[in-house]
Amino acid sequence: MPNDTTLFLGQFLRTPATIGAVAPSSRQLAAAVCAPIPERGEPTVVELGPGTGPFTAEIQQRLGGRGHHLAVEVNEPMARLLAARFPAVDVVHADAARLGELLAERGLWQADVVVSGLPWAAFPQRLQHSLLDAVTSAMSPGAAFTTFSYIHAIPLSSARRFRALLAERFEEVVPGRTVWRNTPPAFVFHARRPRT
């Protein structure tokens, strides 16, 4: 079994538009991205693009057996690895655009938190729109959405377009501090209250 970095790099070389990174995210980035997960209650937490599971581990630690954790991964080898590694997580090999349908199949109508590891800056405009439509329509009115961007992507037109789209789709968008202990360094976007 290859280690996570080897698997990640191999899948990146195979499908760079859906992986978007050459290595798994660090624990520091995972902690920053997963900050909105509530400490109490039975939240429905959706994770998009979990890859090899650095955010998954953080989400599981924060949930401590509460709620429902749905992880949606489009890459089949990574979905298999994730399901084997985290048996308590509801891992599904599917496209994130099917989020509403995936929640409904489980009797879950809305997500309280959506954590995204998707490579938004690598996506064309139409895909950014359709995926964010799926996300916002699946969220409860007070829900939180977090995602991240690598600092080298800041000047890209696709990254600027995505930031504008976040501001259009959410009442509140707050950029977090740069997480330097990640390869490459990244910063987090915290968005709340989807406009549907």
Residue positions per predicted region:
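Class I SAM-dependent methyltransferase Rossmann-like catalytic core
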Residues: D4-R40
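Conserved SAM-binding loop of SAM-dependent methyltransferases across substrates and taxa
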Residues: T52-G65
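Conserved class I S-adenosyl-L-methionine
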Residues: E42-G51
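A short glycine-rich, Lys/Arg-flanked "PGG" loop and its adjoining helix->strand segment in the class I
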Residues: H129-P141
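S-adenosyl-L-methionine
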Residues: M78-L108
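Class I S-adenosyl-L-methionine
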Residues: S157-T196
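Conserved beta-strand signature within the Rossmann-like core of class I S-adenosyl-L-methionine
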Residues: M139-S149
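Conserved SAM-binding motif I beta-strand of class I
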Residues: H68-E73
